[in-house]
Amino acid sequence: MRIAVSGASGCGNTTVSALLAERLGLPLVNYTFRNIARELGISLSEVLERARTDNHFDKAVDARQLCLAMRSSCVVGSRLAIWLVKDAALKVYLLASLKERVKRVLQREGGDVQDVERFTSMRDAEDMSRYKKLYRIDNTNYSFADLVLNTEGCDQETVVSIIIEMLRARGIAW
């Protein structure tokens, strides 16, 4: 059984995926550009800059994510998880306003409000463009997701509890 969780930067995707995996006793698969940045010893901004002109970064992240996900039951958390993990037992998409996402990124990483807002908006636009170009995926169309949750005003534990209730309601065992 695989559970796929997606959402834009700052929606709670990484945190919710990790908590969900922990609560269900499943491995977490969350291999992202941040992992590549750490592995290469460069900043996330530099990886994003390189990804603008080099499809290798997206393809490497997505191939690694899928390879890890196919090994066993797991929670997969990534921007494209609900699109790429086609056999997921549950596909969850997390939402939050740009203002809320910026607030969360600031809490997590610090910085200037205007810089973070500009960076987040730019990243959203670039992600959308790359996903359309590489995979013909419109990441603003998540209508096929089994569960769409607005995480604004919700703590992560509440979001995880809602997802677990959905699993139970569907009779999905873990």
Swiss-Prot record:
Belongs to the cytidylate kinase family. Type 2 subfamily. InterPro entries: Cyt_kin_arch, Cytidylate_kinase_dom, P-loop_NTPase. It comes from Treponema pallidum (strain Nichols). Its main location: cytoplasm. The keyword Nucleotide-binding applies. SUPFAM superfamilies: P-loop containing nucleoside triphosphate hydrolases. Its EC number is 2.7.4.25. Keywords: ATP-binding, Cytoplasm, Kinase, Nucleotide-binding, Transferase. This is Cytidylate kinase. ATP binds at residues 7-15. It is found in: Cytoplasm. One of its GO terms (cellular component) is cytoplasm.
